């Protein structure tokens, strides 16, 4: 029996939410083209679309907003952010950006040349889009077990080092500017990478002159899982684990909207002097001065404070416990989920939930729509729609994992809210055979999952 600790915080301000009727939700979903991204927030009762920018800030962070230095250059809030990033992550240089994909854009532009290959432990939507936009081909080198939702391994985000070596042998190290190592791996179910695997990857890459760049968006969750699952670190602090993790990277991209506990912001970290200079030149073009990167001073201050709060053990323990709580309720009712449970979300296995719907009829997309209609809960498709099309052939990527992500915002919802989510999904699971597939009636050229529209099969 797991322990689900009480919230390690008090509620100081509230935002009212209201349940709609089923009739209303059916109309809202039809208007949204069966795409949960196209729902209005006021139409949603419990919003588990994403944990990106949806977390609750602390009183200290709100206080930090009041001491924003909005100087165009040399903001003292940037200096604070830079000091905190160096203390907790250990990188030499910090370039702020408006959010994570701003950092991805900088990294891809300064490091990739046409014809390159970027290996990584499973793709992520915006990350791969930036890599491909700059002429690279993404190569998945995650362990095979990550593609099976039912295999329960403590570190399913690990890189298969043999796959990495094989790629180096086939294309040459000069064609691999860096490895993109996600800690944790979102599309595998929030799966962590072990410290031992990071160490091994870094050693191999250093041998061949290949840089290691972390997608550090949920690095604190990864640090918690190392403490929980890697015996060597059971007595280590989250802060110390995090610092050691980052020592095996040459830099990272960060969406501050996740583990930095803010509503907007991100940054690129780099140790290399020349790459830093290139990033500073480009950030002026895309984002703003290197000392603000498209952010207000107040937002950099809130992010600096959020980084210090994120490594508090009681905070991160409760965060992960909320995921465990929801997962345990669903699993007890026979609902198929990805195992083991990650740190930011519970992922439903849509192929097993709706085995009668072929992947080409978008089962995860329809499941997310039906969860909303059933109980006003917004979730996100993470399957064939998110995977997009092959840039050369135009054919749909067909990932082995066809998932619906129930993403829990930080410090926002209580266990009672999660009870409603579980009850909604369990009720839907009981009449899952009545659910039909979808046709895609509008498909944008880029990142289609954001704005594509669908209609139910007749």
Swiss-Prot record:
GO terms for biological process: tyrosine metabolic process. Keywords: Lyase, Pyridoxal phosphate. Its EC number is 4.1.99.2. GO terms for molecular function: tyrosine phenol-lyase activity. The modification N6-(pyridoxal phosphate)lysine is found at residue 258. Its cofactor is pyridoxal 5'-phosphate. The keyword Lyase applies. It catalyses: L-tyrosine + H2O = phenol + pyruvate + NH4(+). Homotetramer. This is Tyrosine phenol-lyase. It comes from Pasteurella multocida (strain Pm70).
């Amino acid at each position: 029996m797991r322990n689900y600790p009480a919230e390690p915080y008090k509620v100081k301000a509230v935002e009212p939410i209201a349940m709609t009727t089923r009739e209303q939700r059916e109309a809202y979903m039809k208007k949204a083209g069966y795409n949960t991204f196209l729902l209005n927030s006021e139409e949603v009762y419990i919003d588990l679309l994403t944990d990106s920018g949806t977390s609750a800030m602390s009183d200290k962070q709100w206080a930090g907003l009041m001491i924003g230095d909005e100087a165009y250059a040399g903001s003292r809030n940037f200096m604070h952010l830079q000091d905190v990033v160096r203390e907790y992550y250990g990188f030499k240089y910090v370039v702020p950006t408006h959010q994570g994909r701003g950092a991805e854009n900088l990294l891809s532009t300064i490091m990739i040349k046409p014809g390159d290959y970027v290996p990584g432990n499973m793709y992520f939507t915006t990350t791969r889009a930036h890599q491909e936009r700059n002429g690279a081909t993404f190569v998945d080198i995650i362990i095979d077990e990550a593609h099976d939702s039912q295999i329960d391994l403590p570190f399913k985000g690990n890189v298969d080092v043999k796959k990495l070596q094989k790629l180096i042998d086939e294309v040459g190290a000069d064609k691999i500017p860096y490895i993109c190592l996600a800690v944790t791996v979102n599309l595998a179910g929030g799966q962590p990478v072990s410290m031992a695997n990071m160490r091994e990857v870094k050693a191999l890459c250093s041998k061949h002159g290949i840089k290691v760049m972390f997608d550090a968006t949920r690095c604190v969750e990864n640090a918690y899982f190392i403490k929980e699952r890697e015996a060597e670190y059971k007595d280590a602090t989250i802060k110390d684990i995090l610092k050691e993790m980052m020592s095996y990277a040459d830099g990272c991209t960060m969406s501050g909207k996740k583990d930095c506990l803010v509503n907007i912001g991100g940054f690129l970290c780099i140790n290399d002097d020349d790459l830093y200079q290139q990033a500073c030149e480009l950030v002026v073009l895309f984002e703003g001065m290197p000392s603000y990167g498209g952010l207000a001073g107040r937002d950099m201050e809130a992010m600096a404070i959020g980084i210090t709060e994120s490594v508090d053990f009681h905070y991160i323990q409760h965060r992960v416990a909320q995921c465990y709580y929801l997962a345990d309720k669903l699993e007890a009712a026979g609902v198929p989920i990805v195992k083991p449970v990650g740190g930011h979300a519970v992922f439903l296995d849509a192929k097993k939930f709706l085995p009668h719907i072929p992947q080409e009829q978008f089962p995860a997309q329809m499941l997310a729509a039906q969860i909303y209609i059933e109980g006003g809960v917004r979730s996100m498709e993470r399957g064939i729609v998110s995977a997009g099309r092959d840039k050369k052939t135009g054919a749909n990527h067909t990932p082995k994992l066809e998932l619906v992500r129930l993403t829990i915002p930080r410090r926002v919802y209580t266990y009672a809210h999660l009870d409603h989510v579980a009850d909604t999904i369990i009720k839907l699971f009981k009449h899952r055979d009545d659910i039909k597939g979808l046709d895609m009636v509008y498909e944008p050229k880029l990142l289609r999952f954001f704005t594509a529209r669908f209609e139910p099969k007749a």
